[in-house]
Amino acid sequence: MSNDHRNLESEMPVLPNGPINEESNAIDPCAREFVAVQGKMQQEQPCHSVQADFERLFRAEESSEQPTTVRRELWSYYLYYNGDNGVGPGSYTQALFQWALNGAGWQPGTNPRKPCSNSSPCVVPWAGGTRSVSSVVLIANGLCFAFMTVIFVWFGSAADYGSFGRWLLLVLTVICWCLQYGMMAIKRPTQWPAAMGMYVTAYVAYGATLVFYAAVFPRLARYMPHVQKAREDLKNGEINQEEYDAIESLERNHISNIGYLMTLLINLSVLLPLQHTNYSNNLALCLTNSYWVILGIWWFIFQQRRPGPKVPKGSNYATIGFKQLWLALREVRSLPQTFLYFVAYFLLADGLNTTGTLVSIIQNNHVSFSFLQITYLGITQSACSIASTFGFWYIQNHFKIRTKRMFLVTNLFSVLIPLWGMWEFYFYNVVFGLFQAPYYAYAQTMVSELMPLGYDNMFFALFGITNRASSIIGPNVIQAIINSTQNNWMGFPFLFSICVAAMIAVAFVDVEKGREDGRRFALARTTTRLSDESSLDVGKNGFYTTVGEQSNDSGVNGGIDGISYR
């Protein structure tokens, strides 16, 4: 055996249970152990580690040669985001569904049955008994979030591999488009079961498009030309990691903060001349959906191909999500700040999503399901949204304020909504636009800052699960309260309490520590992968070995005495 090979062995001390981890002086039971057999170095009893499983299932390798984000791709992203604004599936469709319910219902305790008024309690037949209209709408929302959770667990992580994410977003988008056009057929109150089915399915597809589309923006921002230059400056030591993180974070906020005023203004062209026509609401929904189709199609044309790696062996697109979720829960200690944020956001999303639904139910009753009045309220909200998103972005950019601080400011005012109850609907939409629009932007920016590089779809899927799964709880609790009291306002105290608890938890999230945890997380798993793939050829003496993590990198691409590393 050559002196060089002896030196290699001396740098990789071996004990009966594996090499020593030099940093902790602890024995690593899953490190590789080597012996010489018939002139070759062989590994004894390979260890199957959780970390190796994690690397194999999670790591979606991102090549540094990914295409640079170009202007038409960026603007097609803006246009899709603008079209996928929720006015159709989240506002108009729910209002049409609630209109059908209200028309089919009656005032409880009346005989003969009296039709529901805007201010009276209203019940509909449900499972052999009766249930309030507000309760049924909240049940439908709970079903939406339950189905979304299943989708995110099932397919969320699979979007990291190959071109699956690209095609998944296309399919979900087309489903949502078709069902919104289908809602145009809802003309009579007796059609409320069909309206409920289409509303739930369309809203599930819409919610899923938001999550899988949001997973694109960290990579889109990362490959903006000036962000790429900043990454090169970081490699060359011209800027530090903190400065680079600030540049990338601000670009993420810039891409995510887009309003949706135009779709509501366009709808006025239908709603104003046809405001006394019953079918005007359906036409407005058609116009809203067509607006999304016209703006959204360009993303699927101009999006550049950035395929991920192949699905790991032993997994497929249908199973990898469940495997990853199980392993992610086992690895929770590796990213404590990220998962603390997920817990906080679980509560916050539950409170604010359910608050929004409850306010919409009350608001729809108050305006007698008039799409024109709903549009005026939406214009108020979206105008404030546009002003606030760009205003918040300017303030953050000018004063170099961290995302967490901006997020806490938006949280403070958002929490006031369930505290007050917000019966003044125009003022509610002003507050919502000014503070909840940037809240959503900062919420997804926070998770993008806390997640390890290369695990975008997986962590955005977990983020989506946190957002949607949490909202299974709120609607079910609130619908039970409302059904028992026949008073919509009694749901707000519960919502306020969980929002306050969430805000306190967010305050304890250390973003800098979480970002560093994410780097170590990705580096450790990349090191494991490279260690598994690296090998050593000893051409002179005929040796071949696979080198473990404790090997030295000296001699790479050349070596001494015929030794070459690869």
What are these model-derived regions, one by one?
Residues 404-440:
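C-terminal transmembrane helical hairpin of 12-TM major facilitator-type secondary transporters
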Residues 212-219, 361, 441-450:
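Intracellular helix-loop hinge segments at the cytoplasmic ends of transmembrane helices
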Residues 167-182, 405-419:
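Structural signature of the two symmetry-related core transmembrane helices
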Residues 2-73, 184, 188-190, 194, ...:
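Intracellular loop-helix junctions on the cytosolic face of multi-pass helical membrane proteins
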Residues 148-164, 387-404, 482:
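Helix-to-loop junctions at the C-terminal end of transmembrane segments
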Residues 97-99, 156, 266-280, 393-398, ...:
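Transmembrane alpha-helix termini and helix-breaking/packing motifs in multi-pass membrane transporters
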Residues 91-134, 357-374:
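Short amphipathic helix-loop junctions that connect adjacent transmembrane helices
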Residues 457-483:
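A late C-terminal transmembrane helix in Major Facilitator Superfamily
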